[in-house]
């Protein structure tokens, strides 16, 4: 009886290797999408800052603000994939990085719905850039799912980092980090 369970378990573990008949058909888009937000400092800084700022707002903002970002970014991604242009996208992205850094640095408190709109505007441009950079031959649905998942990871990282800001030293570090993000956004604007 024991032999049968071991054999069955080993056979079951081997089955997934048989199921690779469609390698790359869907994974390429998903992996490219997962990678894209991590390929640019502007995206990393903005998305971590969104999570951080949402955490400082507290309450329902911790999940509403990042969720608004992800939802609107998906729409922006679709616009980019469809080739629908937005004005001054790169400038807007640099401005969003600077603005989000300032929101973190000064621990700006605004109502959650307003914060969701603010990050939604930022997300539209970030999503648009992700969409227009869809790699050739990639699965668009997988690509969008990938960059949305990566965004959630970066938001969670920001929320986690914000949890370290307690005490005077933590608050100073948070303000300096927010200022550094704002300066990075300004640097993106000029160069």
UniProtKB/Swiss-Prot annotation:
Superkingdom, natural source: Bacteria
Function: Needed for full hydrogenase activity.
Protein name stated in the entry: Protein HupE
Transmembrane segments: 38-58, 61-81, 84-104, 114-134, 144-164, 170-190
Keywords in alphabetical order: Cell inner membrane, Cell membrane, Membrane, Signal, Transmembrane, Transmembrane helix
Subcellular location field: Cell inner membrane
Signal peptide: 1-21
GO cellular component: plasma membrane
Membrane-topology descriptor: Multi-pass membrane protein
Coarse class of the protein's main subcellular location: membrane
């Amino acid at each position: 009886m024991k032999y049968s369970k071991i054999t069955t378990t080993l056979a079951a573990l081997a089955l997934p290797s048989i199921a690779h008949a469609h390698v790359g058909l869907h994974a390429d888009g998903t992996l490219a999408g997962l990678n894209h937000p991590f390929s640019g400092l502007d995206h990393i800084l903005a998305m971590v800052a969104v999570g951080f700022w949402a955490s400082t707002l507290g309450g329902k903002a911790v999940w509403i603000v990042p969720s608004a970002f992800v939802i609107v970014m998906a729409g922006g991604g679709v616009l980019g994939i469809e080739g629908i242009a937005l004005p001054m996208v790169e400038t807007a992205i640099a401005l969003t990085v600077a603005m989000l850094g300032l929101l973190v640095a000064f621990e700006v408190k605004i109502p959650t719905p307003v914060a969701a709109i603010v990050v939604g505007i930022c997300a539209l441009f970030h999503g648009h850039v992700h969409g227009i950079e869809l790699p050739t031959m990639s699965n668009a649905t997988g690509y969008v799912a990938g960059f949305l998942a990566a965004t959630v990871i970066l938001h969670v990282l920001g929320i986690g980092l914000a949890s370290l800001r307690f005490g005077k030293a933590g608050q100073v570090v948070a303000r300096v980090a927010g200022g550094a993000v704002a300066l990075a956004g300004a640097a993106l604007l000029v160069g």
